[in-house]
Amino acid sequence: VAKDNGDEVIIVEKAGFFGGTSSKTAGVIWVPNSVFLRDQGISDSKDDCLRYLARFSFPRDYHPDAENLGLRASEYALLEAFYDNASVALDRLIKLGVLDAVEWRMWALDRPTPDYLDNVEENKVAQGRAVGVVDAEGNIGQGIELMGQMDRALKKMGVPVLLKHAADRLVTDDSGRVIGLIAKHGDQEVAIKANKGVIFASGGYSHNTGYVADFQRVAVDGSCAMPVSTGDFLKIASDVGAKMGNMSGAWRMQLPFEQATATRAVPAGVFYVPGDSMLQVNKYGRRVVNEKRNYNDRSEIHGVYDPGKAEFTNHLMFMVYDQRTAEAFAGNFPIPVTPGSDAYTVSGTSVSALSGKLIERLAAISGDTGGVVLDGG
């Protein structure tokens, strides 16, 4: 968009390829009041949408009759900015031919996807806000297609993308105004002059274990984020006086624990839990969550703290399913194609046999779990 406005643009990318973590995702963009809703005559008003966003994002603080809906002014302004600009940005990207965007539909079901919290009064548009892209054959694309379309548009517009260039620090003048950026490329420093400004798109800090320990109350044993997501922007911003906001938030997803101990940068998480004869239990054998809830909200169950036992009771959960689910949903992650063909499932012909296998597995990985054991109490 900046290039189309007549500005000169340089993109600096820390990784050795374009696309980042977005290329690993389903490539779904959540856009209120999108062109696809408007074309269908569906009203997604600002007031209603802000109530929904506040209710879902700040459930502890939300109050429908309070100023700013009970949120801090900065939090409310952030939601306002998202509503005001998301659809405008999408419209512009479509107009420029950057994205071949469509209403995102649920694969074989071929219907609009519902919101993750579609059952509350504040949500007046319970489905249809999700937007995706289609590939050359007209099929719904994933994140790799989304980022591929952006990459091709940048090349067509002549925007240089400097790969393996890690932003290191901002350059400011005597008044504090940002006038440039220093990036590191191998053992070299590259100086880039900024006539108007420097815009950052940060990939988070989930692969900076120091930051994770500092800011996350609940264990983050692995992440789908690219390995380059080490929170570099925090120091860059702090050095020029920027104030940090909420650093404890995370978009969470469950994952097989053994997978995370093998490599912190995991290829995928458990998006939706497959199987209809399946449940998740904690180390006490108690079912404590709706397994079919969306991944981010479902994963919050791992942060439950028991003050009587002084423990995070659900730190590890166990996904238990029968032979029917093992066969009917084979290959739907995390269920393996064939039982035992992965590094994280165990099986038994009875509940007691399965318990015995789990006891053995927990003993083998106790150094990574903090000594979690099954407890019939």
Named regions from a protein language model:
Residues 31-81:
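Glycine-rich active-site loop/strand segments that organize a redox cofactor
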Residues 4-25:
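Glycine-rich FAD pyrophosphate-binding loop
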